[in-house]
């Protein structure tokens, strides 16, 4: 194995003791009838917020509240607590998918890199969107890093650039061959979540989740994933930018799925693609929309 791949695997393994997988696969199984987990996952997040607020010594600063929620539902390991819970819980319906039977199957190790070893994670339906389990970690842990840097005084452009750098080197392009635009969207929406705890209109036309009242923070409205999850969380609808060796093989695999896509195009199209691209382009997305089903299959 060449030195570059040995180094890649050493780096990956050092971070993957508690990992479920590096990437997810939203290309296959799109037509499966899977229950939407919006309500049950809303409940998990709201319970975590309530637990932080109702503790014996609840935090009284924005930094403390954000850290408390992250500790409750995020975590220092590769897979966040909510990600591990969702993967195990019978309350969360999953798409039928095996870790090594994915869009990446039969691809060589030099194309798929770490995915060749770890396979892919589970996918769920959330707010009508097919979402990989890894997006929970991006939302809570990477979003928390963005927010923490904001509190330290980093400019928006600087913290967004650091997020793109991490996707390029640690979390994505170097180790998996994939620069995930959907990961960056989840990071960004996670940052907005932490902001929306304290600021009005971060979520359009909604007050902050919390309000300062009588010397403490109290919740004035519930959290819902519907404020943050959209089609650009879906790796197939918001395609990643891949290394050439992977992209060439991935496009062939997508072509093989075109008959299914033509039978039920609604499962394979982004109805508001240009709106979402415009909304998120500034966060560091790399345009690879030529890999959308619409472009490859002529939908």
Set out the residue ranges of the language-model regions.
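Sec-dependent signal peptide recognition
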Residues: 2-10
